[in-house]
Structure formats: C-alpha cells, structure tokens
Amino acid sequence: MSKRLESKYKINRRLGVNLWGRAKSPVNRREYGPGQHGQRRKQKPSDFSIQLMAKQKLKGYYGNISEKQFRKYYDEAVRRKGDTSENLIGLLERRLDAVVYRLKFAITPFASRQFISHGHVTVNGKKVNIPSYLVKEGDVIEVRDSSKQLAIVLDAVQTGERDTPEYVEVDHRQMKGTFLRTPVLSDVPYPVQMEPNLVVEFYSR
C-alpha cells in the first residue's frame, strides 16, 4: 500500500493525533503509534522533528497529499505576496476536495477525493473530477442530480461531528454550496493545532 493510500486511522496513530476529530479514531483509545515499536518511550523531539511533524500533519489532514504536490503548494505560497504560512493554508483550503469536505458533502477528505474523482461534483455547472482543482471566490459547488441520493452524501450531511465554516455557504437540501472567500488559519476549523509557520521553517532550512 502506498503512503498516499495509507489508512486514515493508521495516519492518526502514526502522528499520534486525531486529525479529523472522528469519534472512531484509534487515537482516542491509545497514545502510541502503530506497529511493534509504537510503545517505545518518547525522546525529547528536535527542532527538525517538530517541523517535520507539522508538515506531516498538514499533508495528512488533506488526504495525505504527495510530497511533490505539497511542495508545489509551498513554492506557490512563497511566490505570492503576504505571509507564506497563511498563503499555504489558503491554497490548501481552495482545493476542491477540501471545499467538498467543508460543505459536508463527504465525511472525510479521503471520501471527498474519491467522490470528486468519480464525477459526482460540478463547479459552476460543469463537472470537475480533479480533487486538486483550485476553486475561486464565488464558485458554486454542487452535487450532481444523479448523485444526490447516494448514501455517502446523505451520511456526510447528517453527521453532527462538524459544522460548516463561515467562508463557505451551503444549502444541504439542494446539495449546493458557494466558496465565499479564501480563509486564513484562524478561520479553518482544524480539530488539532496546525502550525504552517513550522512548515515554512522546515522548507526554509
């Protein structure tokens, strides 16, 4: 199994955090990583390991993005004006799979990616099957009519585990939402602390 397809719960155990705030996460029951060496006594982490962990958490949260793609987001964040760490968060939250997840059309980022890849989502009325597609402010994201009664969508909409953030607007009856604005870090409802500034430090070494 590739690292990108690694079980979401295995990612939680490896990182030692409940990345998506799911009630079923094994991290809620155990405080050590997966495998036979998971219970070893932890040493004081180095600056490098802290920065690496911050990067792995952010990559993992968005569906275990590949290193190549994640680095592209970082490089683009550097090129843009303003704070690099905020730019990075803004780019990640503009991914279509992230927006579909925020709109509660999918229960996890992994499910969102698969849902989009299978052609169940439109942007401004046109089918888009690329999870990494970057939406723009004002874009309208909708579940296709033929997909609105799928159990995966209905289950996600009804889950009480999370709310939709203020930078998206959603009508769950019509399965339609609008991306209102690009968020900053403080807007994003991460269940765990994300530290994009440490990601910037990691790549700036």
Swiss-Prot record:
Task: List the CDD domains.
Answer: S4
Tell me where in this chain the S4 RNA-binding domain is found.
94-157
Origin superkingdom? Bacteria
Q: Which GO terms describe its biological process?
A: ribosomal small subunit biogenesis; translation
Q: Where is this region: Disordered?
A: 26-46
Q: Which Gene3D superfamilies match?
A: Ribosomal Protein S4 Delta 41, Chain A, domain 1, RNA-binding S4 domain
Kindly state one GO CC term assigned in the UniProt record: small ribosomal subunit
Q: Which GO terms describe its molecular function?
A: rRNA binding; structural constituent of ribosome
Q: Which UniProt keywords apply?
A: Ribonucleoprotein, Ribosomal protein, RNA-binding, rRNA-binding
- SMART domains assigned: Ribosomal_S4, S4
Q: Which family does it belong to?
A: Belongs to the universal ribosomal protein uS4 family.
How it assembles, according to the record, is: Part of the 30S ribosomal subunit. Contacts protein S5. The interaction surface between S4 and S5 is involved in control of translational fidelity.
| Function according to Swiss-Prot or TrEMBL | One of the primary rRNA binding proteins, it binds directly to 16S rRNA where it nucleates assembly of the body of the 30S subunit.
**What's the protein here called?**
Small ribosomal subunit protein uS4
Q: To which species is this protein native?
A: Gluconobacter oxydans (strain 621H)
